Design a protein with these regions (language model features):
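Structural motif corresponding to the early beta-alpha repeats
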Residues: 128, 132-149, 174-177
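CE4/NodB-like, metal-dependent polysaccharide N-deacetylase domain
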Residues: 151-171, 201-205
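Generic structural signal for well-ordered alpha-helices
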Residues: 48, 95, 118, 122, ...
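Short, acidic/polar
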Residues: 85-97, 148-162, 220-227
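N-terminal binding-site loop/beta-alpha segment at the start of enzyme catalytic domains
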Residues: 2-133, 198, 204
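Structural preference for beta-strand elements that scaffold enzyme active sites
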Residues: 58-62, 105, 132-136, 167-170, ...
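Beta/alpha (TIM)-barrel catalytic core signal, keyed to glycine-rich beta->alpha loops juxtaposed to Asp/Glu
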Residues: 176-291
Length: 291
């Protein structure tokens, strides 16, 4: 592996969105002994969290594959097609560097990088042992032409193909709560077509190891899915939310729904305290660009 990527340049890429600062608070158990086991390591070493369901030892820093090195970046847009041309060699080098330094959680989606992220991610990761990394990808069926059952199934199968794997470690319903009619969109994407039940079946078959969702938007949908879990209707292994470090103190200045004031469950992080089953993946660059 090329050794000419410095820590400075790697973190610079992080600031540009190529790498997402994340925290996988697996299980979020309140047991003090479990917490003690996950204390900070010695300086310069990666911190890990243990998923109690699968016993995955997941790095506290994850790699977001939403914005990858683009050979066309910086070119005059009027002279090009506007399409991304991923610099696969650079992606490989950055992924190698990340794994070498303890990162083992890689988050992608069929929608990222104009649909090219999963393939680039698969190429980079396939050069490593499957046991060295965890892949998170999503059911990103945003467009109405992907709401049909067959189209959504094809999207999942294509993710496996592009990522060059036969199972997904962490599969998410992508960005629930979007749109003017958030409930209607959720039903169209996952319920009316039976795709959520189909994904549950894929988990039983071992093709999905952890099933969860990422949340952006209407908190009512977020609360609804947590209620389903409590009622035993569906089991969520993890939840992924966007959270900038500034949100801890200033989220209410942006939107009161971001805070834990008013009622339990309203805040992005409060459910982690009251629902110890639920790990969270926090994908927000420290510089503000989210992946």
């Amino acid at each position: 592996m090329a050794k000419d990527i410095s820590r400075r340049s790697f973190l610079k890429a992080l600031g540009g969105g190529a790498v997402a600062s994340s925290a996988l608070l697996a299980a979020c158990k309140s047991d003090k002994q479990d917490t003690a086991k996950q204390q900070e390591p010695e300086k310069g070493k990666m911190t890990y969290r243990v998923n109690p369901g699968t016993k995955d030892r997941v790095s506290l820093l994850g790699y977001g594959m939403m914005r990858l090195p683009d050979k066309n970046a910086g070119k005059d847009p009027s002279t090009g097609t506007g399409e991304i041309e991923i610099d696969q060699e650079m992606v490989n080098r950055q992924v190698d560097y990340a794994i070498e330094h303890g990162v083992n959680y890689f988050d992608t989606s069929p929608a990222y990088c104009q649909g090219k992220s999963e393939r680039a991610t698969g190429i980079a990761l396939s050069r490593h042992k499957r046991s060295e990394y965890f892949i998170a990808t999503k059911m990103s069926n945003f467009s109405p032409d992907t709401w049909k059952r067959e189209a959504s199934i094809e999207m999942f199968e294509n993710s496996l193909k592009e990522l060059q794997v036969d199972y997904i470690d962490y599969l998410l319903l992508h960005s629930i709560g979007q749109g003017q009619d958030a409930l209607g969109m959720f039903n169209s994407r996952y319920m009316d077509n039976g795709i959520l039940d189909w994904l549950v079946e894929q988990k039983k078959k071992g093709r999905i190891r952890n099933l969860g969702f990422s949340y952006h938007g209407d908190v009512k949908i977020y609360d609804m899915l947590l209620k389903w879990h409590d009622e035993g209707r569906y089991h969520w292994d993890f939840v992924q939310i966007e959270l900038n470090y500034l949100d801890w103190n200033y989220a209410n200045e942006i939107n009161d729904r971001n805070t834990c004031t008013g009622r339990a469950g309203a805040g992005a992080w409060l459910p982690l305290d009251i629902r110890p089953w639920c790990p969270a993946v926090l994908w927000y660059s420290p510089w503000g660009g989210w992946s």
